A protein has these predicted regions:
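Flexible, compositionally biased loop and terminal segments
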Residues: 1-246
């Protein structure tokens, strides 16, 4: 199935991607690990454009997890340097294409310079209405739930929220993704079949598609395979379809 064969109504409104396999790609090619991350960053540019052209309104990329701080220091520095370069080089194109960039996750552990760069990129693309690209940086699903819990506790103690008002909606409104619809589809590359602490609450009814393809090898063809598979799935959201009554 080609991109032109996928009907707009079957395209996921919100696509999340767990980008995995950069280091394995570099080892396969006999290159240092940072080369894999550079190659992966190039793929991000292509996939952002591909999603926009296919009518996917929201794209969320797991770019730097809370657990990534535990990687070798040199690798962390390389990852953050690539992130800084992406923010500097891609913002103008995102803005001209009408793509809003937003970042979710902790920012306080990043350098003040990177924090300013993130804020600047968000401000310069704020008017984008065609699509929203969300980068999950220093993000963890458990952190997200914990910060919601703290927010609710503060509001209850302050009298701004009654205990009987704490429901799913109250939680959803305080998540890092509060202004986004829940993901419809999550793609994970490199043969891994776990969600690795990503969007734990938000994935409640998401569809998942796993591929052996390493992220630097991911392209529009693989994306279309995922979209074609998603297009024929029946999403039930936990509800069994009613049988026809005669």
């Amino acid at each position: 199935m080609q991109a032109s064969d996928i009907q707009p109504r079957t395209v996921p409104r919100h696509l999340a991607i767990i980008m995995d396999g950069n280091n394995r790609w570099a080892r396969r090619e006999g290159l240092p690990g940072v080369a894999g991350h550079r190659a992966g960053a190039e793929v991000v540019r292509e996939i952002v454009s591909a999603c926009e052209s296919r009518g996917i309104r929201y794209l969320t990329l797991f770019a730097f997890s809370s657990e990534n701080w535990g990687r070798p220091r040199a690798e962390v520095r390389a990852l953050l340097a690539l992130l800084s370069r992406y923010l500097r080089n891609e913002v103008a194109k995102l803005a001209s294409d009408g793509v809003r960039l937003r970042v979710i996750g902790r920012r306080d552990r990043f350098s003040p310079r990177l924090q300013r760069l993130i804020a600047k990129a968000e401000a310069e693309t704020e008017a984008g209405e065609r699509a929203t690209l969300t980068l999950a940086l220093d993000y963890g699903g458990r952190w997200d739930v914990a910060q919601v819990t703290k927010s609710i506790a503060r509001d209850v103690l302050a009298g701004a929220l009654r205990l009987d008002e704490v429901d799913e909606e109250a939680i959803a409104q305080r998540l890092a993704t509060a202004d986004l619809p829940d993901p419809d589809l999550c793609i994970r590359t490199a043969g891994e079949t776990r969600i690795s602490n990503f969007l734990l609450w938000q994935f409640a009814y998401a569809e998942f598609w796993f591929t052996e393809v390493l992220w630097p090898d991911f392209d529009e063809t693989v994306l279309d395979l995922a979209l074609a598979d998603y297009a024929v799935r029946e999403r039930r959201f936990g509800v069994r379809p009613l049988l026809h009554q005669y």
